[in-house]
Amino acid sequence: MSLWLEAPVPDVSPDSAVELWEPDAQDASSQPLGSSKCILREESSTPQSAGDTSRMGLEAPEPTALLPGVEAPPESTELRPQKRKKGPAPKMLGNELCSVCGDKASGFHYNVLSCEGCKGFFRRSVIKGARYVCHSGGHCPMDTYMRRKCQECRLRKCRQAGMREECVLSEEQIRLKKMKRQEEEQAQATSAPPRASSPPQVLPQLSPEQLGMIEKLVAAQQLCNRRSFSDQLRVTPWPMAPDPQSREARQQRFAHFTELAIVSVQEIVDFAKQLPGFLQLSREDQIALLKTSAIEVMLLETSRRYNPGSESITFLKDFSYNREDFAKAGLQVEFINPIFEFSRAMNELQLNDAEFALLIAISIFSADRPNVQDQLQVERLQHTYVEALHAYVSIHHPHDRLMFPRMLMKLVSLRTLSSVHSEQVFALRLQDKKLPPLLSEIWDVHE
């Protein structure tokens, strides 16, 4: 779960720590969930024992059949970036000026009214991770002349105007969009009756290696979920106080959701260690991938627990949370609504355990994550899982050509949700709200 909660946070000891990477940790079940800290960087401090704390996870949803015979439902509406004000971008009158350099604007690019030049400059800078240096102290006035002279001040002005880096699609996201468009065109082309001379279509098949990998992923997920059952009683219970607005009730709700988030993060770490190829990466790349994919995997797991009838999400056994419960815990509506919309859209796909496990693996092995060193190897690993998912979906959804691109586009939607999550965590920091050490470390919230 996400942690930009507005209720006061119980005191957390900064000295207690749990090393999620240590396989032979001692028992520390007596420690409270919120007091554990995940040491994600190479540090000289000695981590304390983790014990059962590193074995926690959310309740497993009812397992679905590995070989479903249910045909996928029609295409659902994709999640789109949500702003505080709903509705389409204002219509252009033709005389608008670029918010960065004052040139003639061509439209709204990356959340800002800007010209084609500043649009392209911002995109190139973000994709390349460019670092510019101003030779005039960083205070150049920006206009159509200076935009060509000082790139640092131009990039700063882009950000000050409101351009959002998360709106820039990576090469992989562009490739996924192109793939979806091609799949749609192929589906339309093949919707006509086939000619008599057309050769029979050859469906892809799962190789023995792919089948073994999928079986291992499903077994690993089920094992991680089973480990969480004995730890569910340690989560601070949802308050049933007569006064739901009392300080004590707000603190309980905050602790409840933060501890659920800790449980989820630790389960993600356990599962990632079981992914073929993950432990062969450097420790630094393992940490970089986990820190930036954790919230996306948490949201995927959340969508598995969505109940369309009651529009609620079940985390603990026999306890469901609706939108109002999320709000009572301190989450803001700008994030609550996208969570439920994404969960509803995922539920309509009716994915089984194998498809969820492959999607999670693809999300974790994203080479464009910050601070990833061996990007080529991460891309190779991700490609292995993408190919396995494509073959699996083609076999189990032979009459739905759009199922595979639909599933991959959900990962693009997750990037949007992840950016909203980052904004909320940053807002929490500005409000001087303290997260438990594990969540502060995984989301880079440093005091």
From Swiss-Prot:
A zinc finger (NR C4-type) spans 98-118, 134-158. Nuclear receptor that exhibits a ligand-dependent transcriptional activation activity. Interaction with retinoic acid receptor (RXR) shifts RXR from its role as a silent DNA-binding partner to an active ligand-binding subunit in mediating retinoid responses through target genes defined by LXRES. LXRES are DR4-type response elements characterized by direct repeats of two similar hexanuclotide half-sites spaced by four nucleotides. Plays an important role in the regulation of cholesterol homeostasis, regulating cholesterol uptake through MYLIP-dependent ubiquitination of LDLR, VLDLR and LRP8. This is Oxysterols receptor LXR-alpha. Residues 1-88, 178-203 are annotated as: Disordered. Residues 95-170 bind DNA. Its main location: nucleus. Ubiquitinated by UBR5, leading to its degradation: UBR5 specifically recognizes and binds ligand-bound NR1H3 when it is not associated with coactivators (NCOAs). In presence of NCOAs, the UBR5-degron is not accessible, preventing its ubiquitination and degradation. PROSITE patterns: NR_LBD (PS51843), NUCLEAR_REC_DBD_1 (PS00031), NUCLEAR_REC_DBD_2 (PS51030). GO terms for cellular component: chromatin; cytoplasm; cytosol; nucleoplasm; nucleus; receptor complex; RNA polymerase II transcription regulator complex. Residues 187-203 have a biased composition (Low complexity). Residues 209-447 form the NR LBD domain. Heterodimer of NR1H3 and RXR (retinoic acid receptor). Interacts with CCAR2 (via N-terminus) in a ligand-independent manner. Interacts with SIRT1 and this interaction is inhibited by CCAR2. GO terms for biological process: apoptotic cell clearance; cell differentiation; cellular response to lipopolysaccharide; cholesterol homeostasis; hormone-mediated signaling pathway; intracellular receptor signaling pathway; mRNA transcription by RNA polymerase II; negative regulation of cholesterol storage. It comes from the Eukaryota. GO terms for molecular function: chromatin DNA binding; DNA-binding transcription activator activity, RNA polymerase II-specific; nuclear receptor activity; nuclear retinoid X receptor binding; RNA polymerase II cis-regulatory region sequence-specific DNA binding; sequence-specific DNA binding; sterol response element binding; zinc ion binding. It holds the Pfam family Hormone_recep. InterPro entries: Liver_X_rcpt, NHR-like_dom_sf, Nucl_hrmn_rcpt_lig-bd, Nuclear_hormone_rcpt_NR1, Nuclear_hrmn_rcpt, Znf_hrmn_rcpt, Znf_NHR/GATA. Residues 1-96 are annotated as: Transactivation AF-1. Keywords: Activator, Cytoplasm, DNA-binding, Metal-binding, Nucleus, Receptor, Transcription, Transcription regulation, Ubl conjugation, Zinc, Zinc-finger. The keyword Zinc applies. Belongs to the nuclear hormone receptor family. NR1 subfamily.
